[in-house]
Amino acid sequence: MRTRTAAGRFACGWLVLLLAACSAPPASALLLGSTLWTYQGASSVFTAAWSPGGKYLALGEADGTVQVRDAVTGKLTFSMYGHTGAVWALAWSPDGKRIASASWDGTVRVWDMATGRQLLTYRGHTGEVLAVAWSPDSRHIASAGSDGTVQVWDAATDQHILTYRGHTNTVAALAWSPDGTRLASASFDHTVQVWDASTGEHAFTYRGHTSYVWTLAWSPDGTRIASGSTDGTVQVWDAATGKRLVTYRGHTNGVQAVAWSPDGTRIASASWDTTVQVWKATSGRQVFTYRGHSSIVGALAWSPNGERIASVADDVRVWQAS
């Protein structure tokens, strides 16, 4: 499967004997929704993930390659090879030194970002691996997939720690709470389940969707979860109680990816209707619709500084988000 509005005027000026002149960038480069760069390779891209510092954008491809590109220019930095199936999900370690890749080949691989060398291969799943997430303290990785399980394992040794079996169908997405104490998992069984990350003890099940739940994201402050579904909605709900707070119905087809802005005020959602929509997290009021793609948008990622969004369809596009 698969802009920054100018904060202030660009000033040109001079400093006697030291600075002669400067020229402003095109105004269009600073407009909300302006496309900064695009990428379309020989192999389809399925996922994108920003490095914690925002310097790099990692891409997972159908041919099993993981690419790391300069986030400003789109220029290829290096590629990593090892998977024998499509790379469906990526997660950077919080310190940006490693990246985990989840693949249809049934493995999760951990790579060194300084050298591109493969460090670990986790083989605990019995089917395609569709989701991977790094714990906030960098010690653990959680992965999930078509076998219906979520597995937590040691990020340094690949030693298995626990398996969560609360779902009855494919687990398509997962996320750690910002404090690292809980995990949320989204499934084709139409539910999102929240559970204790250290014991696997179930906390509660959210049943607001009427079809496959493809995606979820925890708010930066840990109080809310947003989940997107084939039912075409994004639902925002209280992460402690499961109470629904907002239902967003702006899309005309299934929603496959959601992401919170770093300040927690907005949510971006990517849909099979070929759009990415940005809207207020508290009210559901639409702020902007990005229409740069011509096919299903299957993945998106918000840059750490909140200024840009990377979205993935038949092509990858990086565009101004504020």
Residue ranges with predicted function:
Residues 1-7:
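N-terminal secretory signal peptides that target proteins for export/translocation
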Residues 11-21:
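Bacterial N-terminal signal peptides
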Residues 25-322:
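WD40-repeat beta-propeller superdomains and closely related acidic/aromatic-rich repeat-like regions
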